[in-house]
Amino acid sequence: MEKREKILHSVINIIIVILVVIGLYMTMTYRSEYMEFQMRGTVSLRYYTVQSNLFAGVVALLALFYQGKATKVLKLMSATATGLTFAVVLFFLGPLYGHWRMYKRANLFFHLSVPLLSMIEFVLLTDVPRKWKWKVLSAVPTLVYGLVYVLNILINGIGERYPNYNDFYLFLRWGWGVALLIFAGIVLISFGIACLLSGINTKVGKLRRKEPCPSQ
């Protein structure tokens, strides 16, 4: 990685960490002016959006001090997780509820800024070996989240009423069959995002290696 790339890498990761901290503060406080279309307080930690952004923040912080192979793979995983959040909001929740609502206040960071920065930083500045296992591994957090979600409902029941409701994504309104299909589809989409990001990363990496050296 060249000096300018190292500087850009550090700057982007610092920005990611700062935005995650700000977004988490807004999410965890009970100040209604900070929130729009989002749960407040510790209950918000159960949501995939918050967890994926926290993961991205931790990985970005780690990348500031260590840039080994493990960190690069974690970069793909965090870009995939936040990329899934970005895609769901852009193509499903945004058209359904209005993009202006989905990108207000704390959601601007967790639905847009952090996911975009995570994906851009991975695609442009991270070199990851072309191995299928890393792409599969990048879908594992989504798989684990879904399994815990389902197991919690099976063990503790659906719950009484929202927001004290274990099926807080309301997948079971259509029955278990449809809910499991949605779950499987989301995991596959997550894997697809990992493949897409990895593919673009590979192409960008080839272009970077072909860049002519500046004349002396």
Model-inferred region functions:
Residues 27-37, 90-100, 154-155:
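Juxtamembrane "helix-exit" motif on the non-cytosolic side of transmembrane helices
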Residues 115-132:
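Alpha-helical transmembrane segments in multipass membrane proteins, preferentially the mid-helix core
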Residues 105-116, 183-185:
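Membrane-interface loop-to-helix entry segments
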Residues 38-47, 99-111, 133-134:
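Non-cytosolic membrane-interface motifs at loop->transmembrane helix junctions
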Residues 156-200:
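Membrane-interface transmembrane-helix boundary segments in multi-pass integral membrane proteins
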Residues 8-24, 138, 144:
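Alpha-helical transmembrane segments
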